[in-house]
Amino acid sequence: MSANLLKESGPREVFCGLTSIVWLHRRMPDAFFLVVGSRTCAHLIQSAAGVMIFAEPRFGTAILSERDLAGLADAHDELDRVARELLMRRPEIRTLFLVGSCPSEVIKLDLARAAERLNEELQGRVRVVNYSGSGIETTFTQGEDGALAALVPLLPASESRQLLLVGTLADAVEDRLIHLFSKLGIESVRSLPPRQSSELPPVGSGTTVLLTQPFLTETARLLRDRGATVLKAPFPLGAEGSRRWMEAAAADFHCPEASVRAVLDPLEARARIALAPHREVLAGKRIFLLPESQLELPLARFLHRECGMDLVEVGVPYLNREQMAEELALLPDGTTVVEGQHVERQLDRVRAGHPDLVVCGMGLANPLEAEGITTKWSIELVFSPIHGIDQAGDLAELFSRPLHRRQLIHSALHPQASDHPVHA
């Protein structure tokens, strides 16, 4: 593949890494995420999670006041006090994540030192770690990368042979994948993050890592430093990507090819059947992916190769060429891939390209819809269970649905131009 790789910089339109707390706190019910930030940070997380604060969710915000920001108060002492009160009130917490934000980074609040102080005080009763969820230089999915990277140094050492799935998956999807790996002959499969933060998987030279998400660059680097082997494979989105992803693990564990085909061939055939009605809607349509989630390259590969869509432009917030090499190789020749964002210029290219569908952030969706451009929220793809060969049809439906909706609206507004009028 010879993609047209470009890079641009300028004003961006993305969520910050605090958003990842929404799925991480659901994944690890014995963990608590304490954001050190402003009231804006608190409103963002509460709104994104859809959880009222009186329901006692497993996240909260230590709000920096104007005195903190002006340097008139000792924010470190105040943070220690808030953390102690939280742990006394919530004794079920086993891991406390101190999460940095834009305001805490601006005033140079040392959360690493705060975590160290609290760990010394708690003496192992609760593990305290820290990472940055700031959106100053990152996009929202990198919050998970920061959280997992903070856990890697704490993983126990082991040379035992095992497969480690890295990246948050829906529980049902993860259970299904572990079952399929077992049928392939891979019995020892662990996950990071685990379902309980106190049950961290081991890592060492016998560990083979399969990344489930493309945005875990720092986590992958740290796992390599611990001796693990990180496999190169497309990511498990769609039938083709999921199969190649599982085949990479099967090859590393020397699973018999006949056994691999016996397991995966029927699944792929069933996935193709599930894809068929959505391909009828999507084939030949033009799609423009704006940069936000870092899922853009795997999605572009899936939408082109399995759904027949034409790629106008594929935007990515950041491009790790080594980690994304397998995805880049599967894109059609000449695909325009733009790293970074100058949102005004990209919107100009959207209007000039006349795409049938635009994948973008929530902040851009309504203005584009008002211009008559059909959109898909990129954040919905992060919250939906789309990984694995069994989910290929559901993934395609996420893109065919807005086009179908647009057609219904058009038919209702212009019944004389439609052979199939919509009745209330």
Swiss-Prot record:
Cofactor field: [4Fe-4S] cluster
Keywords: 4Fe-4S, ATP-binding, Chlorophyll biosynthesis, Iron, Iron-sulfur, Metal-binding, Nucleotide-binding, Oxidoreductase, Photosynthesis
SUPFAM superfamilies, A to Z: Helical backbone' metal receptor
Keyword Amino-acid biosynthesis applies: no
A family per Pfam: Oxidored_nitro
Record EC number: 1.3.7.7
GO biological process entries: light-independent chlorophyll biosynthetic process; photosynthesis, dark reaction
Gene3D superfamilies with a match to the protein in the record: Nitrogenase molybdenum iron protein domain
Keyword Hydrolase included in the entry's annotation: no
Cofactor: binding comment: Binds 1 [4Fe-4S] cluster per heterodimer. The cluster is bound at the heterodimer interface by residues from both subunits.
GO MF: 4 iron, 4 sulfur cluster binding; ATP binding; metal ion binding; oxidoreductase activity, acting on iron-sulfur proteins as donors; oxidoreductase activity, acting on the CH-CH group of donors, iron-sulfur protein as acceptor
Biological or metabolic pathway of the protein: Porphyrin-containing compound metabolism; chlorophyll biosynthesis (light-independent)
Reactions this protein catalyses: chlorophyllide a + oxidized 2[4Fe-4S]-[ferredoxin] + 2 ADP + 2 phosphate = protochlorophyllide a + reduced 2[4Fe-4S]-[ferredoxin] + 2 ATP + 2 H2O
InterPro entries: LIPOR_BchN/ChlN, Nase/OxRdtase_comp1, Protochl_reductN
Residues engaged in binding [4Fe-4S] cluster: C16, C41, C102
Subunit field text: Protochlorophyllide reductase is composed of three subunits; ChlL, ChlN and ChlB. Forms a heterotetramer of two ChlB and two ChlN subunits.
Family under the similarity heading: Belongs to the BchN/ChlN family.
NCBIfam families, per the entry: DPOR_bchN, PRK02842.1
PANTHER family listed in its UniProt record: LIGHT-INDEPENDENT PROTOCHLOROPHYLLIDE REDUCTASE SUBUNIT N
General function of this protein: Component of the dark-operative protochlorophyllide reductase (DPOR) that uses Mg-ATP and reduced ferredoxin to reduce ring D of protochlorophyllide (Pchlide) to form chlorophyllide a (Chlide). This reaction is light-independent. The NB-protein (ChlN-ChlB) is the catalytic component of the complex.
Name of the featured protein: Light-independent protochlorophyllide reductase subunit N
Organism annotation: Synechococcus sp. (strain WH7803)
Gene field: chlN
